[in-house]
């Protein structure tokens, strides 16, 4: 197994332009596919999740050209649903941002499609989405366990009408349903069962759909209305914002050991909820400055916070490791959906924080972190989870440094993360 040793870093300073957002990249690839016209996507993320989406689109007959550095893609729109005369089997790795939307999109056309993935993907639920698609007339069959991939879709189009979907597990299910709703036979009324998690991710979806000419009427996140007869039309060019979750590591770094760190590609005008991470850092005492398309974090004394993290579940993980450098006990609540991500992130985070000496309480949907008087070095297991690897890079700011096992798992969203991170070290 590959290991990366991060020696103690005394100061971090500089500017970084964040790679494109994973969740925006895969959404716009699918919207551009379903749209009329050609769409040029710039600042596209080059990572595993995006490669799985691109490979699947190519297999389905979608035409696109990708620049040499893989950050610009020109997609020739399919002008509606994807159909296939031959049986298609698509392998989607552990890419939830490809599995969920494609599962929904492939019910719209005609054909037989099987979606498979890595073993972890077979543990990541999709039942809430499939239940909703079945209400609209989809024919979906599970191949192993009910409610989980792999699955087969016998596509004949979707009817539209009233549909209920659970909102308490993952916002990706609703995102997938929203993106296909305009292409059903009738208007769609979506009613949310339970509390909707990660609302800002739904805002991203609705904003991107609007860019492609489709209106969603949002009734306080309880009900969503999508009128029939709408079509996706290419806006011509789409700039993919920098990934706000990826920005969180550099902002936390600036707050813990700045100097100052300026992150460009996200800012006040961002459509991503994860930029609110900077507000959480500010509550801990960090010195934060906002621009339209940048955020600066400067060093300050950090104190513990107690916060509901439902609105920023991915970036909240960075608060868990930043808490090692704050005075007091930090409590992050309403984070049950950490458990159904790339790994069970709640269990993984608790285990690894204890390795470096933190006192940790792991609840069903919360975690508390109290830093020790002195942090210990350790070899951090990353569970094939990009965010675990990046979060624990913060331990480089401890006097003991840290070892990261399997550092290349960052390829899911940020392949050269550690190179960029160490470049800012003084």
UniProtKB/Swiss-Prot annotation:
Gene3D superfamilies: Enolpyruvate transferase domain (3.65.10.10). GO terms for biological process: amino acid biosynthetic process; aromatic amino acid family biosynthetic process; chorismate biosynthetic process. The active site is at 314 (proton acceptor). One of its GO terms (cellular component) is cytoplasm. It comes from the Bacteria. GO terms for molecular function: 3-phosphoshikimate 1-carboxyvinyltransferase activity. Its EC number is 2.5.1.19. Keywords: Amino-acid biosynthesis, Aromatic amino acid biosynthesis, Cytoplasm, Transferase. It is found in: Cytoplasm. The keyword Amino-acid biosynthesis applies. It is an enzyme of class 2 (transferase). Belongs to the EPSP synthase family. Catalyzes the transfer of the enolpyruvyl moiety of phosphoenolpyruvate (PEP) to the 5-hydroxyl of shikimate-3-phosphate (S3P) to produce enolpyruvyl shikimate-3-phosphate and inorganic phosphate. Monomer. This is 3-phosphoshikimate 1-carboxyvinyltransferase.
């Amino acid at each position: 197994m590959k290991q990366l040793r991060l020696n103690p870093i005394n100061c971090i300073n500089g500017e970084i332009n964040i790679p494109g957002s994973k969740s925006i990249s895969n959404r716009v690839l699918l919207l551009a596919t379903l749209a009329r016209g050609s769409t040029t996507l710039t600042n596209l993320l080059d990572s595993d999740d995006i490669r799985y989406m691109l490979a699947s689109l190519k297999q389905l007959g979608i035409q696109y050209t990708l620049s040499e550095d893989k950050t610009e893609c020109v997609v020739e729109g399919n002008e509606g649903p994807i159909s296939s005369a031959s049986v298609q089997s698509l392998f989607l790795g552990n890419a939830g941002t490809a599995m969920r939307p494609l599962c929904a999109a492939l019910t719209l056309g005609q054909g037989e499609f099987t979606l498979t993935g890595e073993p972890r993907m077979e543990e990541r639920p999709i039942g809430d989405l499939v239940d909703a698609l079945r209400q609209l007339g989809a024919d979906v069959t599970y191949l192993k366990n009910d409610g989980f991939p792999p699955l087969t879709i016998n596509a004949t189009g979707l009817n539209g009408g009233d549909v209920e979907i659970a909102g308490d597990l993952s916002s990706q299910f609703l995102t997938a349903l929203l993106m296909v709703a305009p292409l059903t036979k009738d208007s769609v009324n979506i009613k949310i069962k339970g509390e909707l998690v990660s609302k800002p991710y739904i805002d991203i979806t609705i904003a991107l759909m609007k860019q492609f000419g489709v209106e969603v009427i949002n009734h306080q996140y309880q009900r969503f209305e999508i009128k029939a007869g709408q079509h996706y039309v290419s806006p011509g060019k789409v700039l993919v914002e920098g990934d706000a979750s990826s920005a969180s590591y550099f902002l936390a770094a600036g707050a813990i050991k700045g100097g100052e760190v300026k992150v460009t590609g996200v800012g006040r005008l961002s459509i991503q909820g994860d930029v609110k991470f900077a507000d959480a850092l500010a509550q801990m005492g960090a010195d934060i400055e906002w621009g339209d398309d940048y955020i600066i974090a400067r060093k300050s004394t950090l104190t513990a916070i107690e916060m509901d993290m439902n609105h920023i579940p991915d970036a909240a993980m960075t608060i868990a490791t930043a808490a090692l450098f704050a005075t007091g006990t930090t409590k992050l609540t309403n984070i049950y959906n950490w458990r159904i991500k790339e790994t069970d992130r709640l269990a993984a985070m608790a285990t690894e924080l204890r390795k470096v000496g933190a006192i940790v309480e792991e609840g069903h949907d919360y975690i508390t972190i109290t830093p020790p008087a002195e942090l210990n070095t350790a070899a951090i297991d990353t569970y094939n989870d990009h965010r675990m690897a990046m979060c624990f890079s913060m331990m480089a700011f401890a006097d003991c440094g840290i070892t990261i096992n399997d550092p290349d798992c960052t390829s899911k969203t940020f392949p050269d993360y550690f190179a960029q991170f160490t470049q800012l070290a003084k």
